[in-house]
Amino acid sequence: MANKNPLQKPFLFIILSINLIFLQAETTTQISTKKTYVIHMDKSAMPLPYTNHLQWYSSKINSVTQHKSQEEEGNNNRILYTYQTAFHGLAAQLTQEEAERLEEEDGVVAVIPETRYELHTTRSPTFLGLERQESERVWAERVTDHDVVVGVLDTGIWPESESFNDTGMSPVPATWRGACETGKRFLKRNCNRKIVGARVFYRGYEAATGKIDEELEYKSPRDRDGHGTHTAATVAGSPVKGANLFGFAYGTARGMAQKARVAAYKVCWVGGCFSSDILSAVDQAVADGVQVLSISLGGGVSTYSRDSLSIATFGAMEMGVFVSCSAGNGGPDPISLTNVSPWITTVGASTMDRDFPATVKIGTMRTFKGVSLYKGRTVLPKNKQYPLVYLGRNASSPDPTSFCLDGALDRRHVAGKIVICDRGVTPRVQKGQVVKRAGGIGMVLTNTATNGEELVADSHMLPAVAVGEKEGKLIKQYAMTSKKATASLEILGTRIGIKPSPVVAAFSSRGPNFLSLEILKPDLLAPGVNILAAWTGDMAPSSLSSDPRRVKFNILSGTSMSCPHVSGVAALIKSRHPDWSPAAIKSALMTTAYVHDNMFKPLTDASGAAPSSPYDHGAGHIDPLRATDPGLVYDIGPQEYFEFLCTQDLSPSQLKVFTKHSNRTCKHTLAKNPGNLNYPAISALFPENTHVKAMTLRRTVTNVGPHISSYKVSVSPFKGASVTVQPKTLNFTSKHQKLSYTVTFRTRFRMKRPEFGGLVWKSTTHKVRSPVIITWLPPL
């Protein structure tokens, strides 16, 4: 059809031209916008004219930014950090175009964009057996205990807490190279023989978010958030009698390694934690001389060569530092783990045998069990019924109103009533605040399918009880179908001896480790639900700004809480065995872990009450008493970890980010099978090729028990494969002697799902258990 409007084509051309101009402007803006990149360098490639690495790094930045005007900014202002201990490199602000050019430069191994990380947010020592009579040998006072320094990367520390009292501690070892940095409300005297180091890292954070508002948080090691104080006290807090939260969990609070020392590295702020700051803290902590690093945060999963934390902790491991990280709070979804590198000990969360019971009584019909940490001025008489309301559409499918989001509740419908709120979307305590502001007098917090029957107690601002999914559905159904629904709430205090326990926490992130199915993750479980530990004096226990309450101890849940349990036990082991490598300590923790609860039944999963698998609990639940004397260990050195990386289809340049030492090369000692890494867990992965019917994996154990000892092997039966171990007996004649064995898997028929079991070496005094996983990939 002919064009009848002579203006149509020119007008269309103008519109298209304008769109192209905007598109080009937007693209140009994206390319020219600076952000932080972590640049990994090959230090051995530094040319002779340069006298130091900083000079060389500056020239590299200059080479890609030299077209910028001097008025715009100096190149040295682009550099935020340099890294020289755990790994070699720098963090700098670059545009996308500059970063791409820099990656082409000689000596530059990798240029990785800044990553934002998130925090993974008394009774536990007793539950772990560290207060039984036989535990005296573990907590018996030794000078070597005082020599272990645990670096805690978190939100800082509240030094006035009684948990950081240094009474009875020996002088700080001369080998310690750390420092106490001063700043707002943090002086040199805030450090002592317990807190031996305190540093802050914020350049990456400020580059990404702008200057820190010092009216809202301290630009110093002082902790306003509370998370860092809680984790540091869990690792190595001194004993404090009468510790409690509003009378709940009353008892003696103490860290796992109560005589170890703490160095606080503040890397997390109101807006999160940034990789350039975290890496600088790891680098500095290793230079300071820490023996253990406790890192309760995560930032998703990247390939090994693009994961800056993985690269930095590889360097820490090379320097003999044990690294413990939280698995994440992404459970119960599968493949939700973070921090999956084999040289990192990845910790999931479990419950303990302590609870904070509360009840919800609906009408005169029945009573439902729940939990609560509420203690406040408002008390609802337990014998009085109050109107009960649920504003969701149905009992099974939560909606925006049922989540009690801010502004979603109408005072006309909730004033003077107990309100039912579904768990999820917003923090649990915030829901109670929303109910209170709308005039509600109480809250029933109901789990959804995601959380199942797992109960997490909170210090709410109004009377509130949390209940499981099944109970929640019944309570909601009653509220929706009864014309005059009523309920009463009763808070019952603290109860111990809960069965079954431990149970895998529903929120604890799950495997498998999709980067490397041959490496089991998480590695193990530790207590992470309702943990009492020290707290900041600047934040309410609910972490709500409107909450005026202040406490010395708080109860928190998360893999953030389980990680420092393992870090503390690792410090105990290090103090008893100072010559052990990080891998030996990890092996001791994993091979002594248990997989049955206090009812002698297999560990279960709180999200569904079904038995858990190694993808949920790893090698099992930590057992500190046995971990200090494991009998045998599976040791792994830096070169063998590097050999593992050689099996991961990484290019020579990608492998280079892990080689501080230029002479480290692939020797292919694992026969191109990552399952041959001398890991304490054994994973056989049959490929898509159905012609592969058999597979043999090799392990080597080191005797750290009696000089003369004999171990016999036993293996769980599997449906889809036969498993043969050779030899069946290991006879040791000296301490530190190494012996090897092979495990051969022969497929009977390919199973659609992985099979789980265990391999145990047993002597008259020790039992050394490794989880075994057999996986058949679907045929092509």
Swiss-Prot record:
Cited InterPro entries: PA_domain (IPR003137), Peptidase_S8/S53_dom (IPR000209), Peptidase_S8/S53_dom_sf (IPR036852), Peptidase_S8_Ser-AS (IPR023828), Peptidase_S8_subtilisin-rel (IPR015500), Peptidases_S8_3 (IPR034197), S8pro/Inhibitor_I9 (IPR010259), S8pro/Inhibitor_I9_sf (IPR037045)
GO molecular function: serine-type endopeptidase activity
PROSITE patterns tied to this protein: SUBTILASE, SUBTILASE_SER
Biological-process GO terms, alphabetical: proteolysis
Segments forming domain Inhibitor I9: 36-120
Maturation propeptide residues: 26-120
List of glycosylated residues: 165, 394, 663, 731
Enzyme active site: 154, 227, 560
Domain Peptidase S8: 116-628
Superkingdom to which the source organism belongs: Eukaryota
Signal peptide positions (record): 1-25
Subcellular locations according to the entry: Secreted
Record key words, sorted: Autocatalytic cleavage, Glycoprotein, Hydrolase, Protease, Secreted, Serine protease, Signal, Zymogen
Domain PA: 384-477
Example of a GO cellular component annotation carried by this entry: extracellular region
Secreted as UniProt keyword: yes
Protein EC: 3.4.21.-
A Pfam cross-reference name: Peptidase_S8
PANTHER family documented for this protein: PROPROTEIN CONVERTASE SUBTILISIN/KEXIN
Name this polypeptide is given: Subtilisin-like protease SBT1.3
Organism: Arabidopsis thaliana (Mouse-ear cress)
Encoding gene per record: SBT1.3
